[in-house]
Amino acid sequence: SEGRYLKCPGGAPANVAVGVARLAGNSAFIGRVGADPFGRFLHQVLTTEGVDTSHMRLDAHHATSTVVVDLDADGERSFTFLVRPSADLFLTPADLPTFHSQQWLHLCSIALSRQPSRDTALQAMQAMRSAGGYVSFDPNLRPDVWEDPTQIRPCVEAALRLADIAKLSEEELFWLTDSTELDSAMAQLMARFPLRYLFVTQGKDGVRVSTASNQCHVPCRPVSPLDTTGAGDAFVAGLLAALATLDTLPALDDLMPAL
């Protein structure tokens, strides 16, 4: 209600982990939260939702990331990050589990915004690929979080070089390619990076999907949005829950039921 704030669990990778668990998939959260009320709250919620939290570290020296999300009349959001730097950005290689073949690792660019999390995240992506697993990357750009904004593009590009699939908004795609034409921007990104799939979400207009040799558009049902927070994460969760049931990445036609 007006003048009140609601405490909600969140963070894009946590949202995806919960979404996968709700779709009867096996998911785990790798990361750090503060050993504080917000961190314990997130740990409790993820555990209750069926997410494996054995690799969620409670950091006694840094506070849990806390974000105020404001909504406009159309349900669109603005973000204010209250804790800088927060516990999640102090993830180290010692916090990473052993990865295995056929597993999926999903992450966003906030993990790249500061050391030591940046090198740890890139190391995790490489380790998952080396183990025979797959990597999903959603830039989910939040420039205000970055210690050095000039590092955003090179870090995002480094992650795209290690990803099997990527999910971007149109705005993120155009920013990365310096283009304003959707099909050519997608083709440009696919030519620059070794992605198997590129997904560009378009809100009420659905999603564009690209492989190295093909593109298609998948429309969505019309809805009246109340709050778009986590909508992209819900899309990724559904996609990964479906892909995780397969031994290999499918051809584009075989991917359609997941979209």
PLM regions and their residue ranges:
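Short catalytic helix/loop segments, enriched in acidic residues and glycine
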Residues: 2-18
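Alpha-helix C-terminal capping segments
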Residues: 15-26, 71, 242-244
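Short beta-strand scaffold segments in enzyme catalytic cores
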Residues: 18, 66-70, 206-209
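Short, conserved phosphate/pyrophosphate- and ester-handling motifs at nucleotide-, phospho-/glycolipid
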Residues: 20, 169, 232
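Conserved N-terminal subdomain of the carbohydrate kinase-like
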Residues: 26-109
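Hydrophobic anchor at the start of a short beta-strand
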Residues: 26-27, 53, 133-135, 215
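Conserved beta-alpha-beta core of the PfkB/ribokinase-like small-molecule kinase fold
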Residues: 110-188, 195-197, 205-206
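Conserved phosphate-binding/catalytic region of the ribokinase-like
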Residues: 126-127, 178-259
